[in-house]
Amino acid sequence: MPNKRQAAKRARRDERRREINALHVSRMKTAIRNFKKLIQAKDLETAKAKLPFVVSMIQHAAAKGSIHKNEAARRVSRVTQLLNKALASNEQK
């Protein structure tokens, strides 16, 4: 239990922020997971259409401070790379 009133306020604020951050990160991870499932299922046209949505979810989490901007850049790079690799292997066949 906090001893000071300000510490109690900070604890309440931190709890609200933790829940909001968890919401942003969860939405982002779900979008990435669904995107990866599309690529594994070889549904590349749908995956190509979903890429902007996935990127926006990642950037939204970074803009709200839920993840670091460098982590967002890395995740965007990886999902884009994943799609490009799948498209390239599909063209070779």
UniProtKB/Swiss-Prot annotation:
InterPro entries: Ribosomal_bS20 (IPR002583), Ribosomal_bS20_sf (IPR036510). GO terms for biological process: translation. GO terms for molecular function: small ribosomal subunit rRNA binding; structural constituent of ribosome. It comes from the Bacteria. The keyword Ribosomal protein applies. One of its GO terms (cellular component) is small ribosomal subunit. Pfam families: Ribosomal_S20p. PANTHER family: 30S RIBOSOMAL PROTEIN S20, SMALL RIBOSOMAL SUBUNIT PROTEIN BS20C. Binds directly to 16S ribosomal RNA. Belongs to the bacterial ribosomal protein bS20 family. This is Small ribosomal subunit protein bS20. It comes from Hydrogenobaculum sp. (strain Y04AAS1). The gene is rpsT.
